[in-house]
Amino acid sequence: MIDNFGKNNGLTLDTCFVIQAYKNPAITSFYLQKGFYGCKIFINEIVLNEAEHLGFDKAKLLFTMQKIFGRVIVKDVTNEERLFGQHLEKLCPILHSGDSAILAFTKRTSTTLVTLDKNLGKACDFFNTHCIVLEITKKRGLTV
């Protein structure tokens, strides 16, 4: 796991994390273990749209996230964030448009990104952005 904690304003959840938490809420155990209980939880429109594109129902995903975390704040990604994301893609070729917009949102909100995507974690590290990269293994379960 990569975690570069510091002062943060909550957590931004990535698409892969939201989908896995929907399927298996136990992976959210880091939330209590790392002392994040009660912090702001953000899900942005990019995450919801990507999940919907993969066949998930946005309302069901949000309902499940609210059951797990309590209040969940849903935000749009601004045009400025999208443009900033495109700039980030040019600097870090492992990013694609969805991830770059999520990363730009995370940077703007000064939150900690929660993901299962190792490449997105590397991009966060490259751009000095707080992140938690979780790993799920068959043998050990969740690695935080």
Residue ranges and their predicted role:
Residues 1-8, 43, 108-114, 118-144:
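Acidic, PIN/NYN-like endoribonuclease modules and their adjacent C-terminal/linker elements
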Residues 10-13, 23, 29-60, 66-69, ...:
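PIN/NYN-family metal-dependent endoribonuclease catalytic core
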Residues 13-15, 20, 115-117:
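Short His-Asn-centered micro-motif
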Residues 18-21, 52, 89-93:
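Short, flexible loop segments at the rims of nucleotide/cofactor-binding pockets, characterized by
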Residues 21-24, 125:
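Short active-site loop/helix that positions an aromatic residue
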Residues 50, 78-84, 137-143:
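A short acidic, often aromatic-flanked loop/helix-cap motif at beta-alpha or helix-coil junctions
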Residues 58-62, 93, 131-133:
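Short, hinge-like loop/turn segments at secondary-structure boundaries
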Residues 74-126:
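Active-site neighborhoods of divalent-metal-dependent phosphate/nucleic-acid chemistry enzymes
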